[in-house]
Structures are given as structure tokens and as C-alpha cells.
Design a protein with these regions (language model features):
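ATP-dependent carboxylate-amine ligase catalytic core
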Residues: 2-19, 25-113, 121-148, 156-160
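Cysteine-nucleophile active-site neighborhood
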Residues: 302-381
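Phosphate-binding active sites in nucleotide-utilizing proteins
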Residues: 243, 248-313, 317-322
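Internal gly/pro-rich beta-alpha loop/helix module
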Residues: 128-243
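C-terminal and late-domain segments of enzyme folds
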Residues: 110, 215, 244-247, 259-271, ...
């Protein structure tokens, strides 16, 4: 299958992947190019920034969660019809599971999808040393698929010399540069970048970034690289017909500023299987929707809205009544926190929550676990 595509990667986290991926998407939209966007790995937040730029959902490509065929299926399904599919990598290019393998890394996604990779190189405090850095990444794997670099945080007066040096000594193309743009920096917190909605100037930042990239990055060259990507391997046709319910199943989906971490493909899969997803807001609605067969509480930042969630007594009561009555429910991350007795915010104040589950959630000041886990099927309670 012909599907133009590139993967934007870097040597490490914090090198500018998300910022430059969004800038490239914005520059393409400014040129009336129609991109589809993807994020390698399980990150919820970076796809929100992609969506802010292109106006449609961004999708996750995760070989640990979906397997190789699943990754290709998601790419094919959501990239078909776009002028180009732009994938944003995760962490360093080769960084995978447990920090000791390349499984589920950005490289793994490039390998599975046979996608050319363009590396963002953070040039702050770097000149000649850029060459051995690039060479190391090129030759670490025989099939590295790295076809070019974009130089980030580089002085314009250094660009010509850096471009020539890198192209002559490494043999790969330099597709442009981006200067230091402090006014376009994206702020972070413990789970990653702050959400796009939290900053009123997010769209202005992305517009300025897109305008700069149009001036200093070879968008036409990136499109040509994507056009020359090998044909995407076809999988056996996937179908949900065998598991589709005869009758529509109404499922309440908690969806507002406090609960906004979704995998778009999961929602679409539920709909394909016969679910009607009914959004409701634990922050602002008075009670859950009527005639539901189940409830979904995904993640987000309920701790930032703990007081508002706590004050919505009628919503908490309706949820607890439904769950005590046996309504099926999936709650993860922030959703799980909400169903507990209390959430403690960063000031130390405890706010009563739904109280269906015993326990409380509180901030620890730092991440305690980061990565994948494999669970054995069985009863969780009882």
C-alpha cells in the first residue's frame, strides 16, 4: 500500500520532538498540505498538541500494546487519504522497554512500518561533535532508517557550515534548522507537557513556530522523502463483525477537563463493536446519563480539579448508586482516583470523591513507576 510517511525522532527526550513535530504539521497546514499525525508509544498528551494543529485526532502507534500487525493497521486505517503521515517518536530513537532494549522504541515503529526517520539534533553547545553523534546513531543498527536531520536551537549564522560538515562527513541530508525560540517553548509537569487548553497562547506559539519552519526547514524535501517511503506491508483484513453486539450498548464516557486522556482507537473500536459512547462531565453535569449499560473513566488530572469534583455531590451520588447496583465500569489512572474516597491536592487538602473504592490518592512529588507492566489474568478483588 502506498502511504507517504516520515518519523520525527531525536537522540533523547527534551531535544524538541514535540515542538518541531507540531511546527512541521503547522507549516504543512499553512501550505494546504493534508497531514495525518501519530505518536510512538502510549503518550496521551503529545497527540493533543497534534490535534490542536491539524484539527483531527492523532493516533498512537505502540508495538508493545498493539503488536506489529496492530501498528500497521492503525497507520494504514488513519493515514490513508492524507497527503503525508507524520509520526512523532518517543524518548531517544532506540530507547525501548525497561531502558535496556529497543523493543517498543521509535526505531521499532520505524522498522515495523518501514518508515524513513528524520532526527532532531539539539545543537545547543554543539558543533563538530554533531558528526560522531549522528554517525553513532546511523551505525548502531544496520537498518537504522535514519535519512536526515533537522538542527534545533542553532544560530542562523552557523547553519551553512554545520549543514555542509554533516552532509559531507555522514552522507545524510540536513533538512533545515530552527533557531532558539524561547517564546515558543512548551511547558511541562510530572506526566509530560502541560495540556494545550491550559495555555491561551498555545495556538499563537504553534503559528509562530510554523512560520519559522516554513522559512528554515525544507518541507518540500520532507514530502519527497515521505513519498519515497516503501509500500506499507499489508496485513490480513481486520474485522470486528464477529464481536459486534446485535443491540447498541450505551456506555457513559467521562469526558471533560479533568478526564481527557483517551486513545482514539480504543473509542472507535468500542463503537465498531456496537457501543454508543455517551459523553458526560463529572465536573459540570448533575448526574450520569440515563439508560446506561456501563461507565468508562479514563485518565486526566482530577487532582487539579479536586475541589470542583468534590462539590458536585449529585454526580458523585449517581455514580456510586450505579456502581453499587452492579453497573460494569472501567476506571484507570485519574478515573480510578476519582472513584476512591479522597484525593489530596498539592497543598495537602483532602477532597471527598465518589467513595466506591476504599483508599485515597495523593501526590508523591516525583514519578514512582514509569513504563509497561504485564499482568496475569484473574480476579482483582475477592
Amino acid at each position: 500500500m502506498k502511504l507517504p510517511r516520515i518519523l520525527i525522532t531525536a537522540m533523547k527526550s527534551g531535544a524538541g520532538k514535540t515542538m518541531l513535530t507540531c511546527g512541521i504539521l503547522k507549516a504543512m497546514k499553512m501550505q494546504e498540505i493534508n497531514p495525518a499525525s501519530f505518536k510512538c508509544g502510549p503518550d496521551y498528551i503529545d497527540p493533543m498538541f497534534h490535534k490542536t494543529v491539524i484539527g483531527i485526532s492523532s493516533y498512537n502507534l505502540d508495538s508493545f500494546l498493539c503488536g506489529e500487525n496492530g501498528v500497521r493497521e492503525i497507520l494504514k486505517k488513519n493515514g490513508a487519504g492524507a497527503d503525508i503521515s507524520v509520526m512523532e517518536g518517543v524518548m531517544g530513537y532506540y530507547d525501548g522497554i525497561a531502558g535496556i532494549s529497543s523493543e517498543a522504541s521509535a526505531y521499532d515503529i520505524a522498522r515495523i512500518t518501514d518508515t524513513p526517520a528524520v532526527m532532531i539534533l539539539d545543537c545547543k553547545g554543539l558543533s563538530v561533535s554533531a558528526v560522531p553523534c549522528i554517525q553513532g546513531f546511523l551505525h548502531y543498527k544496520e537498518d537504522s532508517r535514519i535519512k536526515g536531520v533537522i538542527l534545533n536551537r542553532l544560530s542562523p549564522m552557523m547553519y551553512g557550515r554545520m549543514k555542509e560538515m554533516i552532509e559531507v562527513q555522514t552522507g545524510i541530508k540536513v533538512y533545515g534548522y530552527v533557531p532558539v525560540m524561547k517564546d515558543c517553548a512548551l511547558e511541562s509537569r510530572y506526566l509530560g507537557l502541560k495540556l494545550p487548553k491550559e495555555r491561551k497562547d498555545t495556538e499563537d506559539k504553534l503559528t509562530r513556530l510554523g512560520e519559522q519552519i516554513l522559512k528554515s526547514v525544507d518541507i518540500a524535501g520532507l514530502l519527497e522523502l515521505a513519498e519515497n517511503a516503501p509500500e506499507l506491508q499489508e496485513n490480513a483484513q481486520y474485522s470486528t463483525e464477529s464481536v459486534r453486539t446485535k443491540d447498541t450498548v450505551r456506555i457513559g464516557l467521562a469526558s471533560d477537563d479533568a478526564f481527557c486522556f483517551f486513545y482514539q482507537d480504543n473509542l472507535e473500536l468500542l463503537q465498531e463493536m456496537g457501543a454508543e459512547l455517551i459523553p458526560f462531565s463529572p465536573l459540570y453535569d448533575k448526574q450520569i446519563p440515563e439508560k446506561l449499560s456501563g461507565l468508562l473513566f479514563y485518565g486526566g488530572y482530577p487532582e487539579l480539579y479536586a475541589e470542583e469534583l468534590s462539590k458536585n455531590e449529585s454526580m458523585k451520588t449517581s455514580i456510586k448508586k450505579a456502581l453499587n447496583g452492579g453497573m460494569p465500569c472501567i476506571a484507570e489512572c485519574g478515573g480510578f482516583m476519582y472513584l476512591q474516597e479522597y484525593i489530596r491536592d498539592e497543598s495537602g487538602t483532602e477532597f471527598p470523591m465518589v467513595g466506591f473504592l476504599e483508599g485515597k490518592s495523593y501526590p508523591t512529588g516525583s514519578l514512582k513507576r514509569f513504563g509497561y507492566v504485564t499482568l496475569t489474568g484473574g480476579r482483582i478483588f475477592g
